[in-house]
């Protein structure tokens, strides 16, 4: 022990000497280290297994220890990468190393270190810990610290991209059990710079591992795309992923046990199917915890905005629990994935659907089809990854919505809860004001007003059971309540049971609830159109059986829906009229439908005992049977609303029934759109049948007819037609191009009792006619109807007293044939009466029957052609116009004019027409319309005239020639012609047109009147004559007047002038001899009386007459007809008296210079006081009155004889030179006598035809002196 200090001292001294020698050796050797560089590199290569290169090695010894500097170090890695350092500086502190017993460096700096590896950095590896390799041992344990300057690490990122990790500066400190680092790291790749991160690490080294500690990262606007896995890059079209973040990671015992991520700002974008989706975060935090042996990831607040829509505030937690040993038989519990979430908005997840589609294409397809939306309030899922059929769940949601996917109906406003597991669970659901589209099943979305349901299930080794309880749904027009149970035993057949009560307030909405996939399209088509309304309070749905065996052809199950519809509207065929106010029971049994009702209205008829059956949906046929009773007039309108409109309906339009009918109806209706078959029989009792083409009605129609669709066939029917008995039968046939109707008719009728002829015609007919007829009607399917009628009969037993040519005695055969061919627009009526009379006509059908053109040909052997233009042409035998006018005056033509419209162009030709007591020979009368009315032309032997019947102007009659000489014209005792108008009836000219008459040459009663003009104006009961004129060439009469034809106040007034140069010539033009010769005349008159113009009433005659005659002679005083004016004033009687008294003085004639007279008439008494005859032999002045009513005279006459050579002889010579000579001679002889007579006075009285003339005074001539 005593020698120990010495030994130690000696040892220490030796060590110091050795160390000194070593240091000295190093001082000498280190500068020459580069010379041993190859050997040193080979040694390193053999130790590492990698070839190492260096361009230079330099070293030196400092006070603290050696320093080393190496240049251009390069090594190749096993994965094909490389490691290189531009320069390494190393300064070893020997004394500190000895003190701490580990390497202590004053400086260890790597300049421009380049590390390139081809091995991708993945999340998995052979070991989860950071084990030390040779390099890690060197850098983590051998170096107490080191620095990296301008270095770079190149590696493959998880996405497969090569990334460059630039390290501008990094300092690493190593303690024996603690490792710390701090610096800047910049990541870049081929796509550009990805940001700069600050890195801090504080790790502890236990058992050779970096097993404990924390790592902190911080980066602003860093691109995370390179750090995402290759799967993400291959499957997600990620465009951007820029975030500002901080992160903490905790390492415990070499494993990552937790961490926190704080995403301050940033977002990502990726390309979807049709648009680019975006995600942004705002201070989103996430916490990762490793709870042995599982993991948990939680986001306490989802501060996420996707596609511009913020997520609602919620939380999300994911946990993975590894497989556990729980003991027992199955001592292993599968690893589980547990999910907890709240306030998830499904619509906000649409952006991640492409990710889901890549993870699970099936899930992506469902998501894309359903497009879910709504809110999941809470969600808890425990999913055993090795036994997913044992998943446990609990959830609640509100207002979920999705679109239909396959047989999953769409929904909206779907709220509810879910609890339990896949093996045993419970679902409660509710919907309000929601629509559930269910295409291929229902034709319209189910419109749910309020729905509640509770559904539970049990799924185990015995089978599957699904129960629905308290199902209460109020949908559009339907309220259903009930439940169901579905059983699927493990080794047995399934069974479904349903019991539900149903009510509806609108049966027309039933089409919404027919499952088309079960019932078939055609049946759903049919029922959708058939049920158009109704109510049901107690409908019942019952189902029991194996759904796979539906429709239970062998009664191994039952499906039945019994619906008692009330107030229903039901259309058994879509194109047929719907039945209304119907109480009908619908019984859906398996694949059939049975319907029945006690009674229903088919239009206006009643159907009873009605049944409608669809025995088998697959056969697609509806069978209907019913008894029908109702008014026949309602049958036609009913079929007009059916597909039989163009056939049976059109027939019933042409043949319209009225009265009650009884029928049996059977309908066979295919549901696939094929034609309906309708059969039945109709019984008629005292009905009526309106035949529209004939516009006539058969009454008291009795009999039967049957029908098959549009084909009708009747038995012999009896009826009454036009008040006459009739036998009729008819049939119809549906042809290839048209629907055909045939009617056979026959009877024996009395024409006078048919009720269709005017009464005046009936009175002229008697007897009966046997006839038969056929009516054929064609109703083309794509055109208008056509028809033909043929009637045949013999008028042998008929007696006619109608005017010729319609007169006929009984017993004389007269065959009649009438044919009609036409359509809905027109028809042609032709016929033959006897052998010589044919007629042809064309009629137009519109709002009123119109005769377009017609021709009647008497004495014709063939059918004459129709006129070329619209009009009527009558070629008649000799006719008695008076008889026809008398017949028409009795109203024979009134009904004809009201029932039809006739053309205005009418031509009548006859060899002789008796009218107005005159025969008009070879007469042709043509009436034709003009622009302003109608023009009538009449030509014949006795007339050539036109009458313009103008609409807005007076009628104009232009008569070129008229000869009217009635053969039986009667004259009065005074030889005046009779009136052309009847005297027994009052003439009413109200409504007569104004007229202008211009006659160039007129003859009346065999006498030529010459020119006759007149203008006639009608105003109420007043007829006004203006511009009246009769100009014979020898005399001219003008007249204006008025005829007031008021009953009880009739009045006629006329005024005008009568002029002429020679009164005897004017009189002789009419064949009358007048006693006045060579005298001009001028008469003005103004007369009025209270009767018709041609019936002057002397008692009411008033007026004034101015008469002036020029120089002339009065001869042959005893004149008759032409001397009325002289006789009226008794001039003729006075002359006779003078001739008698002075027969030696007066000769055969009396010459005068003038005759002037003014006479006024008052109530039939004519007065005059200035009648003056200025004669050559005497002057005669007369005054007094003539009573025209009593026809007597009361006149005074003064005769002043005068004979003067200067006056009288000169006047006589002026009148007639020969007479003047005689007067001159007489004046010489008679001068002494006349010189003694001065004045003669006479009083004339007595009857007008035999006046009494008494001389009152004969006054001698006084002397001149006196």
Swiss-Prot record:
Major location category of this protein: membrane
Record keywords: Cell inner membrane, Cell membrane, Lipid transport, Membrane, Transmembrane, Transmembrane helix, Transport
InterPro entries named in the record: CHP02099 (IPR011836), DUF3971 (IPR025263)
Assigned GO CC terms: plasma membrane
- Swiss-Prot/TrEMBL GO biological process terms: phospholipid transport
**Annotated localization:** Cell inner membrane
Cytoplasmic-side positions: 1-5
Source superkingdom: Bacteria
Q: Where is this region: C-helix_2?
A: 1121-1144
How does the entry describe its membrane topology? Single-pass membrane protein
Question: Which segments cross the bilayer?
Answer: 6-26
Q: Does the keyword Mitochondrion apply?
A: no
Annotated region C-helix_1: the residues are 1203-1237
Q: What happens when the gene is disrupted?
A: The single mutant does not exhibit growth defects but it shows a slight increase in outer membrane permeability. Deletion of the gene leads to increased sensitivity to detergents and antibiotics such as sodium dodecyl sulfate (SDS) and vancomycin. The deletion decreases cyclic enterobacterial common antigen (cyclic ECA) levels, causing changes in outer membrane permeability. Deletion of the gene in the mlaA* mutant (which carries a dominant negative mutation that reverses the normal function of the MlaA protein) delays cell death by slowing the flow of phospholipids to the outer membrane.
Q: Which regions of this chain are Periplasmic-facing, per the record's topological domains?
A: 27-1266
Spell out the residue ranges making up region: P-helix.
94-103
Keyword Transmembrane appears in the UniProt entry: yes
Q: What does this protein do?
A: Involved in outer membrane lipid homeostasis. Likely transports phospholipids between the inner membrane and the outer membrane. It would provide a bridge-like structure that protects phospholipids as they travel across the periplasm. The phosphate-containing molecules are captured along the length of a hydrophobic groove that is continuous along all but the extreme N-terminus of the protein. It also appears to control, directly or indirectly, levels of cyclic enterobacterial common antigen (cyclic ECA), a soluble cyclic ECA molecule present in the periplasm.
Report the domain remarks. Answer: Forms long, thin, rod-type structures predicted to consist of stacked beta strands. Contains essential helical regions at the N-and C-termini, which may embed into the inner and outer membranes respectively, reinforcing the envelope spanning nature of YhdP. The inner membrane-interacting regions, particularly the P-helix, are required for YhdP stability. The C-terminal helices, particularly C-helix_1, are required for function, potentially in anchoring the protein to the outer membrane.
What's this protein's name? Intermembrane phospholipid transporter YhdP
The record lists the organism as: Escherichia coli (strain K12)
Q: Which gene encodes it?
A: yhdP
């Amino acid at each position: 022990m005593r020698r120990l200090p010495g030994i130690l001292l000696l040892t220490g001294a030796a060590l110091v000497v050795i160390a000194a020698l070593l240091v000295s050796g190093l001082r000498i050797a280190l500068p020459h280290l580069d010379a041993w560089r190859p050997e040193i590199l080979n040694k390193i290569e053999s130790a590492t297994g990698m070839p190492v290169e260096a361009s230079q090695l330099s070293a030196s010894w400092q006070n603290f220890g050696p320093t080393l500097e190496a240049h251009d170090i390069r090594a190749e890695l096993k994965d094909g990468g490389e490691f290189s350092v531009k320069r390494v500086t190393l300064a070893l502190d020997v004394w500190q190393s000895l003190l701490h017993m580990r390497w202590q460096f004053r400086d260890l700096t790597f300049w421009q270190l380049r590390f390139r590896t081809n091995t991708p950095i993945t999340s998995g590896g052979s070991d989860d810990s950071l084990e030390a390799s040779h390099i890690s041992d060197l850098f983590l344990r051998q170096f107490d610290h080191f620095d990296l300057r301008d270095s770079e690490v190149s590696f493959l990122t998880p996405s497969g991209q090569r990334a460059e990790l630039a390290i501008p500066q990094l300092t690493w400190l190593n303690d024996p059990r603690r490792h710390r680092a701090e610096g800047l790291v910049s990541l870049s790749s081929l796509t550009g710079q990805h940001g700069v991160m600050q890195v801090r690490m504080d790790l502890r080294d236990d058992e050779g591992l970096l097993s404990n500690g924390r790592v902190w990262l911080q980066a602003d606007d860093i691109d995370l795309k390179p750090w995402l896995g290759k799967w993400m890059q291959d499957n997600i079209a990620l465009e951007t992923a820029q975030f500002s973040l901080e992160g903490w990671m905790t390492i415990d015992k070499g494993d990552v046990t937790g961490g926190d991520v704080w995403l301050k700002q940033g977002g990502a974008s990726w390309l979807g199917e049709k648009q680019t989706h975006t995600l942004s975060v705002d201070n989103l935090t996430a916490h990762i915890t490793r709870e042995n042996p599982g993991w948990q990831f939680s986001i306490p607040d989802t501060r996420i905005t996707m596609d511009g829509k913020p997520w609602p505030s919620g939380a999300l937690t994911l946990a993975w629990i590894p497989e556990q040993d729980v003991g027992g038989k199955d001592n292993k519990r599968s690893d589980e994935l547990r999910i907890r979430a709240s306030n998830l908005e499904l619509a906000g997840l649409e952006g991640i659907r492409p990710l889901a589609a890549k993870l699970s294409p099936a899930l992506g397809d469902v998501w894309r089809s359903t497009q879910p939306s709504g809110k999941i309030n809470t969600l808890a899922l425990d999913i055993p990854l090795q036994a997913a059929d044992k998943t446990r769940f609990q959830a609640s949601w509100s207002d979920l919505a999705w679109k239909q996917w396959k047989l999953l109906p769409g929904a909206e406003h779907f709220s509810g809860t879910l609890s339990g597991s896949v093996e045993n669970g419970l679902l409660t659901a509710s919907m309000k004001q929601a629509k559930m589209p269910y295409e291929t099943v229902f034709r319209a979305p189910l419109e749910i007003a309020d729905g509640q349901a509770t559904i539970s299930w049990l799924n185990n080794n015995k089978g599957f059971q699904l129960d629905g309880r308290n199902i209460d749904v109020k949908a559009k027009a339907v309220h259903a309540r009930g439940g169901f149970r579905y059983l699927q035993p493990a080794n047995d057949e399934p069974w479904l049971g349903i019991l539900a009560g149903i009510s509806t307030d609108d049966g027309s909405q039933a089409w919404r609830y027919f499952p088309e996939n079960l019932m078939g399209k055609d049946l759903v088509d049919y029922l959708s159109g058939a049920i158009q309304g109704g109510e049901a309070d107690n409908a019942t749905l019952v189902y029991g059986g194996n759904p796979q065996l539906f429709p239970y052809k062998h009664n191994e199950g039952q499906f039945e829906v019994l619906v008692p519809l009330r107030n229903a509207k039901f259309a058994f065929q879509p194109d047929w009229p719907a039945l209304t106010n119907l109480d009908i029971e619908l019984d859906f049994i398996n694949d059939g439908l049975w319907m029945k009702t006690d009674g229903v209205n088919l239009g206006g008829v009643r159907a009873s005992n009605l049944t409608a059956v669809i025995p088998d949906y697959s056969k697609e046929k509806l069978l209907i049977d019913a008894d029908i009773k109702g008014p026949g007039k309602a049958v036609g309108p009913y079929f007009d609303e059916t597909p039989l409109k163009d056939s049976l309906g059109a027939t019933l339009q042409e043949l319209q029934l009225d009265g009650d009918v009884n029928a049996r109806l059977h309908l066979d209706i295919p549901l696939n759109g094929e034609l309906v078959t309708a059969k039945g029989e109709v019984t008629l009792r005292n009905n009526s049948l309106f035949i529209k083409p004939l516009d006539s009605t058969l009454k008291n129609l009795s009999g039967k007819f049957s029908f098959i669709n549009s084909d009708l066939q009747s038995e012999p029917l009896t009826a009454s037609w036009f008040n006459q008995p009739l036998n009729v039968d008819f049939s119809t046939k549906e042809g290839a191009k048209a629907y055909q109707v045939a009617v056979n008719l026959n009877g024996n009728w009395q024409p006078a009792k048919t009720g269709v002829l005017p009464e005046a015609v009936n009175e002229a007919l008697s007897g009966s006619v046997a006839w038969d007829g056929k009516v054929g009607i064609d109703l083309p399917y794509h055109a208008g109807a056509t028809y033909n009628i043929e009637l045949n009969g013999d008028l042998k037993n008929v007696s006619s007293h109608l005017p010729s040519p319609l007169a006929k005695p009984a017993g004389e055969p007269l065959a009649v044939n009438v044919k009609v061919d036409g359509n809905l627009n027109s028809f042609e009526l032709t016929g033959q009466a006897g052998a010589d009379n044919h007629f042809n006509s064309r009629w137009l059908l519109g709002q009123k029957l119109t005769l377009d053109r017609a021709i009647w040909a008497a004495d014709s052997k063939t059918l004459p052609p129709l006129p070329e233009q619209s009009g009527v042409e009558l070629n008649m035998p000799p006719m008695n116009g008076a008889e026809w006018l008398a017949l028409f005056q009795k109203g024979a033509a009134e009904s004809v004019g009201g029932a039809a419209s006739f053309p205005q162009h009418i031509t009548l030709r006859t060899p002789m027409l008796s009218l107005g007591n005159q025969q008009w020979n070879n007469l042709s009368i043509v009436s034709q319309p003009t622009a302003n009315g109608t023009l009538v032309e009449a030509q014949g032997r006795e007339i050539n005239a036109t009458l313009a019947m103008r609409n807005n102007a007076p009628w104009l009659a232009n008569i070129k020639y008229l000869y009217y000489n009635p053969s039986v014209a009667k004259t009065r005792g005074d030889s005046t012609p009779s009136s052309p108008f009847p005297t027994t009836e009052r003439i009413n000219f109200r409504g007569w047109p104004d007229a202008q008459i211009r006659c160039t040459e007129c003859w009346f009663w065999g006498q030529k009147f010459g020119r006759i003009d007149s203008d006639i104006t009608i105003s109420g009961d007043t007829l006004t004559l203006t511009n009246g004129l009769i100009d014979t060439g020898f005399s001219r009469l003008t007249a204006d007047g008025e005829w007031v034809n008021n009953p009880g106040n009739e009045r006629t007034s006329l005024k005008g002038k009568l002029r002429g140069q020679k009164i005897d010539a004017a009189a002789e033009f009419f064949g009358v001899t007048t006693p006045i010769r060579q005298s001009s005349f001028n008469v003005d008159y103004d007369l009025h009386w209270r009767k018709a113009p041609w019936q002057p009433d002397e008692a009411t005659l008033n007026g004034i007459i101015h008469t002036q005659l020029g120089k002339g002679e009065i001869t042959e005083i005893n004149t008759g007809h032409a001397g009325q004016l002289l006789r009226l004033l008794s001039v003729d009687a006075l002359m006779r008296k003078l001739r008698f008294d002075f027969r030696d003085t007066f000769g055969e004639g009396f010459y005068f210079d003038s005759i002037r007279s003014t006479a006024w008439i008052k109530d039939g008494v004519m007065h005059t006081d200035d009648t003056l005859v200025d004669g050559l032999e005497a002057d005669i002045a007369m005054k007094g009155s003539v009573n025209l009513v009593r026809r007597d005279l009361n006149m005074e006459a003064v005769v002043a004889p005068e004979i003067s050579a200067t006056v009288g002889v000169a006047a006589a010579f002026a009148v007639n030179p020969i007479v003047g000579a005689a007067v001159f001679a007489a004046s010489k002889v008679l001068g002494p006598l006349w010189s003694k007579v001065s004045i003669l006075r006479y009083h004339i009285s007595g009857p007008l035809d035999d006046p009494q003339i008494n001389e009152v005074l004969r006054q001698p001539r006084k002397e001149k002196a006196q």
